[in-house]
A protein has these predicted regions:
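Non-catalytic C-terminal interaction segments of nucleic acid-processing enzymes
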Residues: 1-61, 72-165
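Conserved catalytic cores of phosphodiester-cleaving nucleases, focusing on short active-site segments
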Residues: 63-69
């Protein structure tokens, strides 16, 4: 193991992502075509976060990940008055506190567009993310296998944002 990272997970996460203990990653000190790998060690700690759901300890200003677990949550956050105002405040805090705000939405494009207000919520979400400069990752989840894959993806995102900020 050549490097160690600590991922901080908000204590209010109801169904937290599952992070691996180790990751084999592309060595950032070598050119990518060399395909040199390094192993990094990950530790996860739970702590109440004021903004977002996941950060890399010591790199809070580089990247913050906010996770939304369902279309229903996004629909409420984007289309319904009080929830929308709260969601906009979250997006403002993300933009103010980090150079790379990321919203992870669990689900598939088909799920998002199939539900009754789904397509309207998608339009509202895209507009809000554009207005507040937030990146969107749309990834399936729900079962443990997907939460592990999503956890690995988020870990790689947090680490790589830190390496190249």
């Amino acid at each position: 193991v050549q490097r160690k990272y600590v991922i901080v997970q908000d204590t209010r996460e109801k169904l937290p992502l599952l992070f691996p203990k180790r990751l084999v990653m592309l060595d950032d000190t070598r050119p990518a075509p060399e395909k040199k790998a390094i192993t990094v060690e990950l530790h996860t700690v739970r702590q109440k976060l004021q903004t977002g759901d996941y950060i890399l300890s010591g790199s809070e200003s580089t990247c913050i990940v906010e996770r939304k677990g369902s279309l229903l949550e996004i629909s409420k956050n984007c289309l319904h008055g009080g929830d929308r105002r709260r969601f906009v405040r979250e997006l403002v805090r993300l933009r103010e506190e980090t150079s790379h705000p990321v919203l992870v939405l669990e689900g598939s494009p088909a799920q998002l567009l199939d539900a009754g207000e789904g397509s309207l919520a998608v339009d509202a979400l895209i507009r809000l993310l554009q207005e507040y400069g937030c990146e969107l990752l749309l990834l399936p989840s729900g079962i443990a296998k997907h939460r592990r894959a999503l956890g690995e993806w988020v870990a790689r995102l947090l680490i790589n944002r830190t390496l190249h900020d």
